[in-house]
């Protein structure tokens, strides 16, 4: 399994629509204003989060249960900035829509800018032939409110290509998050 370069990422985005919308270079300024970088890097792609968030509040249930998650546990927020309460989390989605090739597994890592502030980004791998907007989870590990900025870089996707194509892809098995759009809550 090998990690893919900026050249490969550009080629796959342009020819195969792997990432839409796509920035072929790193973007560090928008309208002469400094932003947290996003776009193509040497061996990855830095994604942005959209301006729709679901902020977790612990007012409706005593237990968090992935098999019976209560949607009322979230407050919907739309805006350029999302404030996450201390020791809580928020869900968001990428601006970018992904179409992962059959021979590729994509890993997401948080950006150091957020990690250095105690904000952790978590995403499970994007499996072969999965497509959709990526649901992002931001954990605020601090005892202070934390800000997340919409339309700026939040995480980096790394593309790993296998030396052998898988027998069964995410699409083949009818994965439950296939084609997701918007922030998607847990499904069982």
Curated annotation (Swiss-Prot):
Metabolic or biological pathway: Pyrimidine metabolism; dUMP biosynthesis; dUMP from dCTP (dUTP route): step 1/2
Residues annotated as catalytic: 137
GO terms for MF: dCTP deaminase activity; nucleotide binding
Record-level GO BP terms: dUMP biosynthetic process; dUTP biosynthetic process; nucleobase-containing small molecule interconversion
EC number: 3.5.4.13
Gene3D superfamilies: 2.70.40.10
Record's catalysed reaction(s): dCTP + H2O + H(+) = dUTP + NH4(+)
Signal peptide: none
Transmembrane domains' residue ranges: none
Enzyme class: hydrolase
UniProt entry keywords in alphabetical sequence: Hydrolase, Nucleotide metabolism, Nucleotide-binding
Residue positions binding dCTP: 111-116, 135-137, 156, 170, 180
InterPro entries listed in its UniProt record: dCTP_deaminase, dUTPase-like_sf, dUTPase_trimeric
Similarity section: Belongs to the dCTP deaminase family.
Protein role: Catalyzes the deamination of dCTP to dUTP.
UniProt subunit comment: Homotrimer.
Protein known as: dCTP deaminase
The organism of origin for this protein: Chromohalobacter salexigens (strain ATCC BAA-138 / DSM 3043 / CIP 106854 / NCIMB 13768 / 1H11)
């Amino acid at each position: 399994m090998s990690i893919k370069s900026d050249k490969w990422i550009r080629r796959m985005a342009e020819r195969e629509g792997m990432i839409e919308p796509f920035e072929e270079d790193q973007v560090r300024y928008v309208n002469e204003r400094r932003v947290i970088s996003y776009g193509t890097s040497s061996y990855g792609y830095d994604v942005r989060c959209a301006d729709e968030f679901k902020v977790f509040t612990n007012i409706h249930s005593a237990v968090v249960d992935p098999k019976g998650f209560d949607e009322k546990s979230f407050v919907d927020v739309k805006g350029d900035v999302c404030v996450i309460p201390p020791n809580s989390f928020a869900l968001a989605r990428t601006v970018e829509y992904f179409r992962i090739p059959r021979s590729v597994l994509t890993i997401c890592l948080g950006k150091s800018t957020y990690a250095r502030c105690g904000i952790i980004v978590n995403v499970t791998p994007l499996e072969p032939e999965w497509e959709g907007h990526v649901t992002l989870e931001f954990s605020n590990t601090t005892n202070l409110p934390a800000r997340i900025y919409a339309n700026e870089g939040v995480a980096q996707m790394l593309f790993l290509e296998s030396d052998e194509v898988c027998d069964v892809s995410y699409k083949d098995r009818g994965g439950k998050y296939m084609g997701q759009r918007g922030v998607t809550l847990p499904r069982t």
